[in-house]
Structure formats: C-alpha cells, structure tokens
Design a protein with these regions (language model features):
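Residues forming the flavin
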Residues: 1-532
C-alpha cells in the first residue's frame, strides 16, 4: 500500500510491515510507528470528533498530551476506549475505531450541535434545564447522560491479567531525555540503586525528535549508546512504557508499567499492566516540556498541529502531515520545524512569525509581523488566511499548519503535596515550586532549561547533589558537547478579534468561553475548568 506522506530516514524498521485497521479500512505501517504516525503516513488527517460540538478533529501533538486523536483499540473482550493514538504503539493486526460520533466519522449526525453553539456557551448547563423541575429526571438527565463520554466498553470479561508490585531504590529518575540520561549515568557509576522510568517505548526524549549532534554523533545515536551502557549496570533498572502517576508521602511514587499493551495478546504468564509502588530515598524529575499552541480563528481543523510535534513526526517517524506545510510561530523554534521539513523535501508554504524582527531565510518565505487570522477546510486544512503588518490579508495554500507558542515545563508532579508553581517572565511559563514534595528535585526542560547542553548539565548536577546527600561519592560527569542556543521568544497567546479560537480542543472551550467565565467571576482556574 502507498504511504503517501512517508519520508526518508526516521527510526522505524522498514524491513517489516505491520497491517492494521482504522474504522474498517486497511492500512500498513512499520515497527517503531505509533498509530498516529502510521495514520499520518497513510494521509489520514481526520481521526475524531470533539466532545460538545462534534467538530472534526485531527492530531495536535505527538505525545500523551494529545486531546483529539482518542480512539478505541482492539475488539471483543479486549476493547479499550479512550486511548491516545499518539502513544499507542503499532503492532501487526491492530484494530482501531474512532469515537464520539453518530454515523460515520466524516458524516457525524451530532455535528448539528455546532449549529447551536451560541446556546451552549460556558456554564450553559447551570443556566438551562431549570424549568419545569419535573422534567429533570425523566427528560433532561437521560439526554445529558447519553451525550456524555467518548468511547464505549465491551461489557465482556477482560481475559488479560493485571499485577501490582513494589520496588525500592536510592534514586528514581522520571524521564529519559537528555537530562534523565545524564543523571542516570552519574548515578549508575556511583553504585546507587537507580530506577529510570519513561512513559515512551523509546528512551531519549526530544533527542529522538531533533537533528542536532552530541560529540559529533546524532542525538539519537548518543541516546541509544547511553541506554545500552545503562543496561550493563546491575544497579540500574530501566523502565520504558512506564508512567509515574503520583507522589505520595514518605518518598512513595505510583507508576503504571504497560507490559503488554504493544502486543496483540500478552505473552503466556505475562500481565498486561503492572501498578508499582516505588519507594525511593531521592527522586529527580526530568519530564521535559510541552509545547503550547497559539489560539486563532478556527485553529482546530485537522492538519493544524504543534510545530514541535510536526518535527517529531518528521525526524523520528519519517512522516509529514502534508506535502505542503505552513508555520505560525512567536519564537525561533518554529523555524527549526520549517528547516527540518524543508531538508526532507517538504514544501514550506511560508513561516508566519508575529515578530517584526523575525529571522529571515533563504529556504522559505518569512512573513514577519504576520498573524494567522483564519483557516479553511471542513474535514481538513486547505488554506490559512494571514494578516500582514500593512493591514492586508493573504492566503497560503497548505494541508498542514505547525503552531508554536513557546514551551511549558512539565511540572505536574512538583505540584503534588500543595507545591505552588512559580511564574517566570524569562520563558513566559510556570516553573517548579520551591515547596514541592520532599526529596524531589528537577532538571532539564522541566526546570525551564530549554537547551540540550543545559539539560545535560542540570541533570548531572542535580543527580550529583542528590547522591551526595545519600552518602555516595559520584565522579564528575563527562558530558558530550551539545547545542546551547537559547531560543528567542515573544510571548503571544491568541489573535485578537477572533470569535471561535479554541483553547481546549477536546472539550470545545474557546477564548470567548474563558472571558465569559472570568466576567461571571469564575476566576480561579479550578472554577474555570468546571464552568467551561
């Protein structure tokens, strides 16, 4: 079968081919693919429908933060709802279905809700269904309950087994990107008992998504060689496919290891998943950062995704969402995506940079001071409308738009135990609190250090401090030379004047909804989250 959007390179095994189904149609992919990357390679952009308005949705991200491409995996008793296509490893015989639709994915009858969006704004359910009161249990409540939820379950007994267990270590390292790998090397050589956990099946973090070098070798090769070296230590336990899900008292962490989710059927005697309790003396969070979008009119069409995710699909999975791509950015990182895609033969329709002093390029057109004010394409992006500094508008024909509004450190675990994040004007994002969980330190992009050199250095330093507190004598880390260019960024959150600019694409929350909530005094983020 023809994979129209498959590029050269990548970290997939082209010597093998996996067959899989999505909504009853047959497709092919390769070992190393996720369901999302394989669908993009086969030129599938429409993968779901939004919760409230049932608007068409495509892939936005390349990781566990994905709000749109949420599907049902497998069939029969093993049917599993609400699984992110971006984290589901492809395997031979995989069957997936789209969710939250009445009819087909292309012709969802519930999309009629979008026509009544003016009546379904923030807090509408607090203001309606009030009269007559007798209608609530027999009329209103059944309708609301039927509309709620996304996927469905099989109602059959699960044939697989699930386990729980207990682990103990001196240092738990959360995240296996450059900071986590550097920290693990220091800890391994000190003789400490180390656990290195990462939610991905391929350790390396952003090194798997970039094209820069470390010590004259690719970041991918350095990550692979480092993982192999760590495997040689008896005091190191590597845990890929493992999500650290909570920080509890006395250095206890919860972790979910997906032992067999990447297989059609678990191996004999093996559980599908294991819930671990990890007891650790010290912990180091190296969970990286998540790119944030920019809100603009109709920014939710299939084909519009984060620029960093676009780079991940291109460099790691050898996939482009379209053969013609545009970029909308407020920082230099968006230009990296354009450069990488151009090097792989993808046409760059233009880079729209909100900064008047945006860097120029001989590889593609840069629209400095421009803004994306609208998009077109019902089931997939076809054009974007751009406003220029001179007050005029122009149209760019493209099948995909990469959006980059900066990066937010992944500090979720540091906010457990009532830790309060600290705002940083330097990166226009929240950074880890100083009053986080006892024994937990932070390194790398999760700390706000967005260069590879900075991540490596902070990972090694924080590990050294933690080990010395435990009485170990770590040797000085020998770190590879890596890129250390700080990305320039101008904070920019949304395009003024837009009426339907989406902030929460899964739940159909717009900028307008947030403003209305604030106007009605739902200012606290917890109140805002529930009111919208």
């Amino acid at each position: 079968m023809n994979q129209a959007n498959r590029l050269a390179g990548g970290q997939i095994d082209r010597s093998q081919t996996f067959k899989f189904k999505f909504d009853g149609k047959n497709f092919v992919g390769h070992p190393g693919d996720t369901l999302a990357s394989a669908l993009l390679a086969n030129d599938v952009r429409l993968m779901g429908r939004s919760f409230k308005y049932h608007r068409p949705r495509g892939i936005l991200t390349a990781g566990s933060e994905e709000p749109n491409a949420i599907v049902e995996l497998r069939e029969g008793a093993r049917q599993e709802p609400n699984t992110r296509a971006t984290t589901a490893e492809l395997f031979d015989g995989l069957t997936a279905k789209s969710q939250n639709k009445v009819g087909s994915l292309k012709f969802d009858l519930m999309a009629i809700n979008d026509r009544f969006s003016n009546f379904l704004t923030a807090g509408f359910y607090y203001k309606t269904f009030m009269w007559p009161a007798a209608f609530w249990e027999k009329v209103y409540e059944p309708i609301i309950r039927k509309a709620a939820g996304l996927g469905s379950i099989s109602f059959k007994d699960d044939p697989d087994s699930y386990d729980r267990g207990f682990l103990y270590c001196d240092l738990l390292i959360i995240g296996a990107g450059p900071a986590g790998l550097a920290a693990a090397l220091v800890a391994a050589k000190s003789g400490a008992e180390v656990i290195l956990a990462d939610e991905d099946f391929n350790m390396g973090g952003r090194l798997n998504s970039e094209r820069f070098s470390l010590n004259n070798q690719s970041g991918v090769d350095w990550a692979r060689s480092t993982v192999l070296e760590l495997k040689s230590f008896q005091n190191v336990r590597l845990m890929p496919r493992t999500t650290i899900l909570g920080v509890f008292d006395h250095g206890i962490y919860g972790a979910l290891e997906r032992v067999s989710d990447h297989l059609l059927v678990p191996q004999a005697g093996k559980p599908r998943q294991i819930l671990w309790q990890i007891y650790t003396k010290r912990s180091l969070l190296c969970a990286g950062a998540t790119e944030r979008p920019i809100a603009f009119e109709n920014n939710d069409r299939p084909g519009i995704m984060l620029a960093g995710a676009m780079r991940s699909y291109a460099n790691r999975w050898a996939v482009t969402p379209s053969q013609s791509v545009a970029i909308f950015t407020n920082n230099d990182d968006g230009h990296k995506t354009a450069i990488d895609l151009k090097a792989l033969g993808v046409n760059i329709a233009g880079v729209v940079d909100i900064r008047l002093d945006a860097p120029d390029s001989d590889l593609y057109e840069v629209i400095a001071g421009g803004q994306v004010v609208n998009t077109n394409g019902r089931l997939g992006l076809t054009t974007v409308t751009v406003s220029t500094p001179n007050g005029k508008t122009r149209s760019l024909a493209c099948g995909a738009l990469g959006v980059s509004g900066g990066w937010n450190p992944n500090i979720h675990l540091t906010s457990h135990h009532r830790g309060r994040p600290v705002w940083s004007d330097d990166i226009a994002a929240f950074c880890p609190p100083t009053d986080g969980p006892a024994g937990l330190s932070v390194a790398g992009a999760a700390l706000g250090s967005f260069t590879t050199a900075g991540a490596l250095s902070s990972g090694a330093k924080k590990a050294t401090v933690a080990l010395e507190e435990l009485g170990f004598k770590p040797t000085k880390a020998v770190l590879p030379e890596a890129e250390g260019t700080i990305t320039k960024m101008t904070p920019f959150w949304y395009v003024e004047g837009c009426s339907r600019a989406w902030l929460d694409q899964q739940n159909d929350v717009t900028v307008k909804d947030v403003k209305l909530s604030h106007q009605e005094n739902f200012v606290s983020v917890e109140h805002l989250k529930r009111y919208t």
